[in-house]
Amino acid sequence: MRIKELDGLRGIAVLAVILYHYFPWLPITGSAYGWLGVDLFFVLSGFLITSILLGLREQEHYFTIFYSRRILRIFPPYYLALAVYILVCAVLGRLGGFGLWSPYLFYYTSLYVHDPMQVHGVMQYPPLAVVHGLGVLWSLSVEEIYYTVWAPIVRFMKEKMFAATLIAMIIAAPSLRWMWYYPGHLEYFTFYCRMDALAYGSAVALLIHHRRVSPVAWAGRDRFFDWLAVAVIPIAAVFFLIAGGSPDNHYVETVGVLLADLSFALVIYAAIRRSGGNQLWVRLLRARWLRSVGMVSYSLYLFHFPLLVVSHDLVGKLHLPRRVDALGVDLLGLVLSFAVAYGLWYGMESRILRWKDRKVPSPAHA
């Protein structure tokens, strides 16, 4: 069963990322925190994937069903975005060497930092350089690696063991971020340092799984998680107000991200429990426009940054005043991004998803 409130959270996540990438020049304090939208995506993905795997756990064709459905969901838009962007770069004579874009082709960008500009903290790239436009794909590498390693763990490990694995991941990732901290985002892009967000989402899936089995016994535990959310979310908000929104901060990358991911997990848990409820925040998550953005969030995330780079190149040829140029780049990028995302959804994604559900049925929609 599709949970509408989670579509709303996906919409918030992708809008936060777009705000961060498109409008850093606006005097809007919240735009500095938009990078946390990626963490919200990670927690949501951890929940979704683990929920699916728990539903498939006793299926004879567990791996075939899971991986085939994931491939049909993830690969078509991903490789279309990759192909179109590389083609544009080739036409403009800015393709670069195979080593620059091959990590995106094979999903291993988050296993190591392949771009020396990231290692040295230089995040300004030449317009339409391949690495720049494809930079956002690192997060999909993190998720794909998690899908690959987590499915066997859920299938073969006893529940206590994979719960212990989640705890180990939640402890290990911030520890690695602390030890590996470098202003060039070395710790920001790697799977090993970001796996805790996915683990938080997986923990929520495990809690929901047990809650459905014995809802009466979980009444007291639900109250505990409500009080935990009341405590943690304000602490996280105060922390970020004091520490600032930049990820180029040792304490933000460790303590801040930990608090943010835990807050997102608690919000997701509460949203699932209260799905369909009349609380104001729950109704806001069900807003039709926000769920619509959440529906196309995958393609919107894939294309928004490459199209921003393309818009920068096109508008830059007009030699407009700086502020007008920045606004023109952002508006053109936004229009193109939403047009492409909705076009892909209705023209390709939704059709593939319907075909997937017919050909590779699953107890839980993937």
Where do the PLM segments sit?
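Alpha-helical transmembrane segments in multi-pass integral membrane proteins
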Residues: 1-6, 12-35, 49-65, 87-99, ...
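Short alpha-helical catalytic segment bearing the HExxH-like zincin motif
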Residues: 7, 66, 137-141, 147, ...
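His/acidic/aromatic-lined binding-pocket segments of jelly-roll/cupin-type domains
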Residues: 39-42, 196
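Alpha-helical transmembrane segments of multi-pass membrane proteins
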Residues: 68-81, 154
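Hydrophobic alpha-helical segments with transmembrane-like composition
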Residues: 74, 119-172, 190-198, 205-209
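Hydrophobic alpha-helical transmembrane segments that constitute the membrane-spanning cores
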Residues: 80-88
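Short helix- or helix-capping micro-motifs
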Residues: 103-108
